[in-house]
Amino acid sequence: MIEPFERKIWLSSPTMHGDEMKYVAEAYETNWMSTVGKNIDETERLLAERVGVRYAVALSAGTASLHLAVKLAGEAMYGQAVIGKGSLSGKKVFCSDVTFGATVNPVVYEGGIPVFIDTERETWKIGRAHV
């Protein structure tokens, strides 16, 4: 029989700094419970300013960010996707064999074909000899 762990090891726990409830209440009271609003607009503006670009986009999760990056990379390489098809439609995309689903799923969502490449034991990078 497998014994359960005494303590849970969190993959990632939230970090709170004290003002979160104030901002949640403000969003609720002003009916800005959405992907837009002054807090998001200001976050995007500050981020763009900090990294020295004209625009930045705040997304709901890292997975959404990876999907957007894959979509834009596909469009930059192959042009705008046909309606109903992904930006990587039918294209093979090299992916590490040691990964998390969020890094491969956007390739599939965009119609690409993931090709898993062995990872080098010492560096955890895709092995050049395997490409």
Predicted regions and their residues:
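Conserved small/polar residues in nucleotide/adenosyl-binding loops
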Residues: 129-131
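N-terminal "arm"/small-domain region of PLP-dependent enzymes with the aminotransferase-like
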Residues: 1-34
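Glycine-rich phosphate-binding loop at the start of an alpha helix
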Residues: 59, 63, 101, 125
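Conserved coil-to-alpha-helix start sites within the AMP-binding
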Residues: 98-104
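Conserved PLP phosphate-binding loop immediately N-terminal to the Schiff-base lysine helix
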Residues: 119-125
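Phosphate-binding glycine-rich loop
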Residues: 36-92, 106-110, 116-118
